[in-house]
């Protein structure tokens, strides 16, 4: 155990609850950990109290089984990453928010399956998106879908104070995932025929900083959620700022919900 005065190496934390989405989050977190040369820490939170020893045993057994399954999936990917596991006790949201103080990023699945895996989107993921002390990735579970040659990362250029950090994270993910970026921004729709010099300048400056990232600017005044609802582009990840965390449900959406056409869009909330 590290001494009080020794610095603690930050990790990529993944919330594990036994769901397919959590496995997806763990696999997604592997490249994040490797790229930063830090461990991948798989965390399965159990209840703070139990009405009986049998209930505790069931809860602990589920957590241990979930961690084994997640670790096996990560190891099967064949990538060299140090794996750590932990089973803390407490409400999942507050426990993971506190753990995020010592994390480079925290990754969670957006849906749960079964008795123990609750619907994370409505509780834990939302709490993390609003309160975590590091970026938060909310991952959709993968399903069989037609192959696509392009799997975009989408981000919006705004005048928000944290937008530059959001753009830098989008560029980092584009390099890591070898994906092109759709950059939304510019004038309102009714003025889209008029060139927006500021938007064009920011895109050009961004490209100069990251010449190896393919950036495709889209002039639109709509937000990411509305843009995705109106277009058919296949998007693997939307990158948003902490102040945009209220969009999370619209971007990720409940599984199979007819209103959310882009229910397979994962989200990275850039919190600092």
UniProtKB/Swiss-Prot annotation:
Gene3D superfamilies: HUPs. The lineage of its organism: Bacteria, Bacillati, Actinomycetota, Actinomycetes, Mycobacteriales. One of its GO terms (molecular function) is ATP binding. It comes from the Bacteria. ATP binds at residues 15, 109-115, 123-124. Belongs to the universal stress protein A family. SUPFAM superfamilies: Adenine nucleotide alpha hydrolases-like (SSF52402). The keyword Chaperone does not apply. It holds the Pfam family Usp. There is a cross-link at residue 82 (Isoglutamyl lysine isopeptide (Lys-Gln) (interchain with Q-Cter in protein Pup)). This is Universal stress protein Rv2624c. Induction: A member of the dormancy regulon. Induced in response to reduced oxygen tension (hypoxia), low levels of nitric oxide (NO) and carbon monoxide (CO). It is hoped that this regulon will give insight into the latent, or dormant phase of infection. One of its GO terms (cellular component) is plasma membrane. Keywords: ATP-binding, Isopeptide bond, Nucleotide-binding, Ubl conjugation. CDD domains: USP_Rv2623_repeat1. GO terms for biological process: response to stress.
